[in-house]
Amino acid sequence: MQLTRVSAVSVLMAILSGLSMGCSGKKKQNLDFSRGLEGWTHRDPRWRVEATSGRSGSEAAVWKGENGKFAEQLKRSFAVEAGGIYRVGVWAKTVDFTQHGVATKPVLCCGYSDRNGKYLGSFWANEVIDNISCTDGWRYFEGTTPPLPSGATTLSVSLTFRDGASGTVLFDDLSIERLGCEPIAYVTSSRYRDEGFDGTVDFHALLQINLVKYPLETLRPVFRYTDASGKESEVSPTVLKPNEASVTLRVADLAKGRQDVRLVVRTADGKTVAEAACPFTRLSNMPQSHVRFDGHGRTWVGGKKFFPLGFYSPGDWDPKRWAPYYAQLTNGIINCLLPYREVSVETIRQFDAAGVKTIYSLREWLWGTRCCKRDYRTREASLAKIREIVNELKDEPGIVAWYVMDEAPLSQISFLAELKEMLHQIDPDRPVYAVTDKPYDIRQFAATFDVVGMDPYPVGNHGGAKIDIASKWPIQAAEATWHSRPMWQVPQTFNWWWERKTEVNPEHRFPRRDELANMCYQAIAAGANGLVAFDLAGTTRKDKDGTTGFVRTREIYQELKSRIDLFLSNPGPAVSTMPEGTVVRTWRRDDGTVSALVVNTTRSDVSGALVCKGHEQKKIDLPALGYAVIDLKAKGN
């Protein structure tokens, strides 16, 4: 989503004038439309203010018409501060409001930018669940920003709707509230569960310091820790950027046991600007947890290497519907399922006995999400129920991870961080798994999960031409997490038309066999250490041509399974040159053989040279969407 930019001049003038409409210094500001559209901008003359149409008979902003456009938004800008957390809310009401003939909802979206108008991020507000049963037609939409990044000065609020909307929509009583300020969002480590017994460990901090008040060159940050002799030590970051401070330490140089490795940021004259810590534990030997990750991001289950290869699936099974597929799911090709809904212990054990592990979804009890069950829609009730579930199931060997994030908004960060800490305390044997479709948000969320997945679904999504996001997104995620989080990617095994029946798009279809194989191999070449496709039900539904994708998906998974030994090998040599339009990953097998997976990320033929450190150049020719596993010859052999 690309929001309309605010000009640098207008932002600067607003700041200098005190910005009567701003909230950088105010705790909360409420705005109605009693002064018409003063202070608001729009590009559609159909926006107006109607007296007595608002809540309690007040004024309301109204749009009425046909075939509206998202870009024809009613927009207003507010001054904000870097590091601040802001909650935005508005009341909305619709009358005969549809999109392509189907009832739809209005949209509240917000973007934040720097003083030059550079876009820094955005979020969409959600309808507050408690208002679904309202009787007067007014519903409340609310969203919360993350701690705003360094350089953020402006928050732009847009009241709008999706393209193709028709009917009437009304808005009233906008509120902007500053909740707090977090100059350091978090400090995290590169080690699973923030513990280790050998090698090195990286500590990374996400900075959100107001660099207008505290220019980077005036700051003196240090990481503080207790060393192996018991003395307090400190070291300057090896990497210091406007939004990041990082350092690498030897685990052996840390005191044994648990301690806080703390980042303290001071000014040159000694004033403390901010501090935050990562609890880290130096162990005496390798942890013996049921599920763990090694330094290469590979999963180990019960002491054996494990490459997740599975699907999102229904919860408990309808025997009549799934009987024809059960044998195909338990014949050794797939090894895990992620039931999207509550699943019984009996089902978990049934699949475990057949060699299929369960990634247990907690999404139905996650506070602040639309899928949360009604009885658990407070933060306290949500955490209490999840604690109960995990305590009940944590001894089940068939469970390999807890699924806690399903394309969550940034407003969920504090809850997910608390949830991860709770899960680590209750169950030391399993990781926390998160999936998102927002690569630009990954760094904000990085401290809330142990293993991450991106779910790019390019086929039929906005034309389906740019299939390369199947590798670009995981590459972005790896960079955003400092290459410190394992990755279980989510390939597309469904037809977008099933989700968007209001759209007329001839590209809506189930992925062809070559597309599906390409997306899977792209993900692996980009660094994925597992695949959990969305979704199994999608492979069994009939497409427009009357076929299903189950057979082609099963064939591709069988091919992938035949190469799992390669995918679980140690990393190979660095790639210095690759053909344009490709993504490449190398491995070194136990016998010393080096192999490379080369994937064409385009819908055109590609060719060029592949050069890996210490190995002879290889000529590559791949057809559109093609891929190949090739052996590399060491120089001098």
Task: Indicate where each model-derived feature is located.
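Bacterial N-terminal signal peptides that target proteins for export
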Residues: M1-V11
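Bacterial N-terminal signal peptides
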Residues: S10-G18
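Extracellular and organelle-lumenal recognition/adhesion modules and their flexible linkers in secreted
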Residues: C23-T248
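A short tyrosine-centered beta-strand micro-motif
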Residues: Y86, A245, G257-L263
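Internal, hydrophobic beta-strand segments that form the core of beta-sheet-rich folds
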Residues: S158-T160, Q259-R266
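Glycan-processing catalytic domains of CAZymes
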Residues: F197-G199, H204-L211, L263-R266, T272-K635
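Surface-exposed, short loops/turns at beta-strand junctions within beta-sandwich domains
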Residues: V251-G257
